């Protein structure tokens, strides 16, 4: 079983691990990577602040954070009692410099803002989005014109 950069969208990794174990034949292998603790710190900081802003907080009253991004230690704890014969979990720093502001804005627009934009009514979407972009660029833009964001990965290899 293989997955690349998708499983942070799956919130119940306990169930994921149990189903993976069930699906694998004896000696079968699961290999995946997904976002881990510390991923996109700038963006998530901006968003946590923005959804608490008095102008927008009513739209996020029932909002559930859409990602599961554990630390290596947290994931090791999750896998401990699943029954796998081998478990290897590593963390990777995959920090990224976007070539320019436009490249970062494209990343903000798709996929990063999608779960938030679904909560905001049409009449304030543009204002909300523009404020997020402006704050992100104020924090991420480097003197050379690139834009920096933290990216942290969890790499998992499981053998049944």
Where are these regions (language model features)?
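Conserved class I S-adenosyl-L-methionine
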Residues: 29-55
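A conserved pocket-lining segment of Rossmann-fold NAD(P)-dependent short-chain dehydrogenase/reductase
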Residues: 56-63
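A conserved beta-strand element that flanks and buttresses the S-adenosyl-L-methionine
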Residues: 2
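Conserved Class I S-adenosyl-L-methionine
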Residues: 63-160
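A short His-aromatic
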Residues: 8-10
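A short glycine-rich, Lys/Arg-flanked "PGG" loop and its adjoining helix->strand segment in the class I
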Residues: 14-29
């Amino acid at each position: 079983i293989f997955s690349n950069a998708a499983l942070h969208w799956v919130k119940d990794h306990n169930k994921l691990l149990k189903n993976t174990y069930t699906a694998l034949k004896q000696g079968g292998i699961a290999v995946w990577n997904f976002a881990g603790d510390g991923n996109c710190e700038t963006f998530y900081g901006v968003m946590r602040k923005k959804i608490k802003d008095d102008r927008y907080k009513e739209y996020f009253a029932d909002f559930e954070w859409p990602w599961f991004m554990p630390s290596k230690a947290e994931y090791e704890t999750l896998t401990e009692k699943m029954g796998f014969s081998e478990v290897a979990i590593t963390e990777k720093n995959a920090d990224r410099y976007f070539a320019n502001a436009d490249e970062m804005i494209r990343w903000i627009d798709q996929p990063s803002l999608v779960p938030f934009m679904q909560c905001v009514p049409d009449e304030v979407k543009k204002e909300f989005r523009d404020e997020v972009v402006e704050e992100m660029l104020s924090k991420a833009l480097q003197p050379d014109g690139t834009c920096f964001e933290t990216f942290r990965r969890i790499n998992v290899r499981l053998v049944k």
